Amino acid sequence: MRFQSNGRLKSASIETYLLEKVRLIAPGAGERNYHIFYELLAGLPQRERKDFCLGNARGPQDFHILAVSGTFDRRDGVEDRKTYQDLRTALTTIGFSGDETKELFSVCCALLQCSNLSFVESSSGASEIDTSNPALRSALKLLGVSAEDFGKSLCCSAIEARGEILYKTLSRAQATKALEALMKATYSALFQKIVNRINLSIAKADEKCDNTGDLSIGVLDIFGFESFDANSFEQLCINFCNEALQQQFNQYVFKQEQAEYQQEGIEWRFISFPDNQDVLDLIEKKHEGILSILDEQNLIPQCTDQSFARAMYEKCADHPRFSVNSSQKILGNFCIEHYAGIVEYSTVTFLEKNKDELPKETTELLKSSSIDFIASLGAILATSRSPSPNGKKHSALRRTNSSLVRESVGSQFSGQLRKLRGKIEQTAPHYIRCLKPNDLLVPGSFSPAIIADQLRCAGVLEAIRVSRVGFPQRYPHSEFARRYQMLARKHIPKHKRYYSEKDLCEIVVNAIALLIRNAPSNAVHDR
């Protein structure tokens, strides 16, 4: 948020980090997919359901990406029908017209239908879309593409050779992966389109690009430290972010503490404070860190999750924060000792999630749509860009014969995090820790153990320990003088209004020190 010199809000913008696209395809057990799908199924009027090919749908259980987790209702008891109305109001507020809102909903419903598609395999191993599946017709209608183009984009891979385009048929497993890539890319582009529209609605129309001299406030909302029964690439990125911001929090607390002591002229030797730089090096150090090893493996044509795991075990074996036992090696797992505790990760799908390959056919398919809104999503994917480490813009895409290979997700995330930390270092940050009172998401229930664990993970308990070792009681001079001057009445000047509050405090402290030195030990105890 940017403000004028008089404090008036000038404009605002939002930025996203690490969209969890894997949730769209495979939400975890006990977790829901993105709320939008449930809200549409619960809230769309009957007259509109037919337009979105939902006329015969009973509910979330009819669509694979919603049924796979077995969880349909929100744990907090909020009704999807009500939040659907809130959603429509929000879309209108940020500038979506009625037609655009329908097109947005149409894309979401297309993803539901795509999740129900299936493939058949011929005797030669070539795949084809199962045309007997009723979801196919609905998906084609909602996406505005032809059956021929749709089938070719999912079941074939285009190869350019000497100016000629050849098509290679894909296996059923490869076609399924292509469908998942199409769904994730479409959802990602839709998400980015909404973000772009929000930024357009909250930016000042005549705002210049140069905001030098603006007063600004940034609000960073991030996931807390994560440790589940199964932890994957997303948890590594989230915990990497938390490690980096925790280090910044530690340094800021020390810096602020030291500045205050120096300002007051207080001599105090700082106690040791856990430094997690070694964890950050383990994750991001060039050529040696886990993300760097992952990027190197992604460049090897025949790499697998197993080959990545072996390379990581070899390079990280001696790192004090890295551990792996024989049974974990069999599974491709490893452990990192984070500042908040030890977390075990599985390397399964690490390569795929980090590579984030976008089949060239996907962008071409969306761009060929007869529906302008969906064609615009293809354009967003084709022109996707990311910031380079030096702050300049460069294309985040490089072409191969059959796909657009983005800068790896890990590299993009590291760059975003580096830029974010640079911004924070130029500000005066204020930290707000949000704590869950219980794991059941129910009101009126407070679990001290859960709260204590969150405070420990967030580094709050450690910060309190540092404060206690120093001078935890911090009275303003005026408050201290008012409260304790009665102990030094004989020493307080009659015309004390001519003395500063700090001078009065010194008089009180010196008088009490003299009183303690001159009094018998038992008298001091009695006082």
Model-derived features: where do they sit?
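Short basic/glycine-enriched coil/helix segment immediately N-terminal to the Walker B
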Residues: 103, 208-215
